[in-house]
Amino acid sequence: MKKVIIVLAVMFIVGIGCKKTIDPGGGPCACSPISNVYFSLSVKSSNGSDLLNAANPGAYSKDQIQLYYKDAQGVLKSVDFSIRPPFSTPKTTYAFNQLFSNTLAEIARSGNHIFFLKLGDRQPMELNVKVVGTKTERLLIDQVEVPLEPATAGDELYLKSIFSLKL
């Protein structure tokens, strides 16, 4: 009987300690891993093809992409990024590669909001990134707001935070 009471007490304490907020993107609970801030951008052609997929004509490889910012002294510094492949979860399938960077989001959160993205031989584009907490809230490219990928209420949180650039 004592074992049953102890097990119930432990379950009660764990249940109280691990309550998650209903708001998606809310803070981590006591048991979950801490989430990092990130920046994610898909790049598409005017006809909707993935320009980060090397198999598509006119696409850019990671070597053809430069992401950088100017520090307080005006020195250009590169920003680490990766190309994430398409993904699928039980609720969502996303068929596009994404330019992904934790570093860009951390720098933007610390106060420097202006970055530059150079794709192949194109002119560098100015990115103005607004980060609030652990979410990239807004992206302007050359002073034009870039929309988030269309998502529904049941979609994964990550999908709801991918910006979609059409060239």
Where are these regions (language model features)?
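Detector for glycine-centered tight turns/loop "hinges" at secondary-structure junctions
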Residues: N47-D50, A72-G74, R122, Q143
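Extracellular Ig-like/FN3 beta-sandwich strand-entry sites
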Residues: N36, R109-I114, R122, T136
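Charged, amphipathic alpha-helical segments
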Residues: T21-G25, S45-G48, T92-T103
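Tryptophan-paired
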Residues: A54-L119
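Short amphipathic, basic-aromatic surface patches that mediate peripheral association
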Residues: P28, V43-G58
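Bacterial Sec-dependent N-terminal signal peptides
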Residues: K2-V7, M11-Y38
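Glycine-rich, aromatic-bearing surface loops/beta-hairpins
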Residues: Q123-L167
